Curated annotation (Swiss-Prot):
Domain of life from the UniProt record: Bacteria
Listed HAMAP family: LexA (MF_00015)
Annotated site residue numbers, Cleavage: 92-93
Species for this entry: Lactobacillus johnsonii (strain CNCM I-12250 / La1 / NCC 533)
Name of this protein: LexA repressor
């Protein structure tokens, strides 16, 4: 991209890619307008037409919102095919409001290649999982799934729309999200939404 509007087109391309990764379907034109600070939907349509002409996106004429970022488009964004998204921050202490923004991308570990497209990473904040070897500042690799077996470590969304990393247990009439820290109490919930199962761990700095 070399024309004056190239940066804006890349911004739009990035927003489309991140939105699809986050919620599995593309944004509306008005959502794109808001995200990239454009007031005119016709301007966005023009940028989308140019992105399609360059081969960065594919559109389905029969489905107005069907937009797919192509491999060429991912290359323009610097995203390798085996990269996985790092999504916001999730607590491993007291739950915090879940953040669903994609911060960056991380190379997929070779032993998890079969899970490509179903994985995301979250940075852990807190010490509630230290007995399981998950420390403050670690990145957990999570397989997207909506259920888990008792004893598995999951990323769960509580009824207050907060995300947390805990060991999952389904009890009689309630759910228990158990920390791996002897000084902390479990979280007891009548309803819990599982975002995924922790399948790996990445630590950038080791003391």
């Amino acid at each position: 991209m070399t024309e004056p509007h190239a940066n804006k087109q890349l911004e739009i391309l990035r927003f489309i890619y991140d939105t699809v990764e986050e919620r599995a379907f593309p944004p509306t034109v008005r959502e794109i307008c808001s995200a990239v600070d454009l007031s005119s939907t016709s301007t966005v349509h023009g940028h989308l037409a140019r992105l399609e002409k360059k081969g960065y996106i594919l559109k389905d004429a029969t489905k107005p919102r069907a937009i797919e970022v192509t491999e060429k488009g991912r290359e323009a964004l610097g995203i390798k095919p085996k990269d996985i998204p790092v999504v916001g921050v999730v607590t491993a202490g007291q739950p915090i409001l879940a953040v669903q923004d994609i911060d960056e991308y991380f190379p997929l570990p070779p032993d998890l290649e079969n899970d490509a497209g179903e994985l995301f990473m979250l940075r852990v904040h807190g010490e509630s999982m230290i007995n399981a070897g998950i420390l403050n500042g670690d990145h957990v690799i999570v397989r997207k799934q909506s259920s888990a077996n008792n004893g598995e470590i999951v990323v769960a969304m509580t009824e207050d729309n907060e995300a947390t990393v805990k060991r999952f247990f389904k009890e009689d009439g309630y759910y228990r999200l158990q920390p791996e820290n002897d000084t902390m109490d479990p979280i007891i919930l009548p309803v819990v939404q599982i975002l995924g199962k922790v399948v790996g761990l990445y630590r950038n700095n080791i003391d």
